[in-house]
C-alpha cells in the first residue's frame, strides 16, 4: 500500500515530486514499515499525530498511519543523500522507535509540497514602511509553513514622533504589531499545527506601557493582539533600578 500511497499523493500535489521520481526504492521502504511500533506511542501521541501532523485529503481526513508519517518524514530528509533509500530507512528506524523525534514543522512539512522544515525564525523590524511591510509578508509565509517567529519592534519610533516625509505624527509600533497579529490569524492553518509569533520590545521604549497591555482582554481592540504573544528585553539598567527600588 505504501508505494501506491506515495504515488497517489504526489499525483494529487500533496507530496513533493522527488518522493516518486525514482530515487527511492518504494517497495524496499514499504518492507521496512513495522505497524507494531505504533504501540510505542501513548494514546495522546497517536491522536496528536493524527490531528496535527498526518497528511490529509482536501476534505480534512487523514490519509497516513503513524508509520506512514514516520517514513514520509524520513524520505523528505533524505532527498540529497548518496543512497536516499538507505538514509530514509535509517531515519525511519530512529523515528519509529522514538529514539529521535523531529520538530513540529519537520513533522508537518517533510516530504510535502511545501517543505519548510525549520521551527524558529527571528525578524527585526526597522523604522521604515518597507521593513514593516516585509515583516508582515515574511510572517505570513513563515506561518504558512508552521514556523514560530520572534519579531523585534524596538526600532520603531514612538507614537507622536514626527514623520518627515508626510509632515504628520507616527502612530507608534502598536498598530503595526496588530497587523502581525492579523496576519497570523489569516494564515492560522485550522486543524493542523499553526504558526506562532512573539513580539519583542526593549523596556526603554516610550510606548512600553502600551506594549505590556497588548494581551489584555479589555480595551481598544485595535491596540490588542489575540494570537501574537509578547516578550520583553530587560536591560541591565532596569534591573539595577529594581534592586535599588528606583523609578
Describe every region a protein language model picked out.
Residues 1-247:
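Extended catalytic cores of very large enzyme megasubunits
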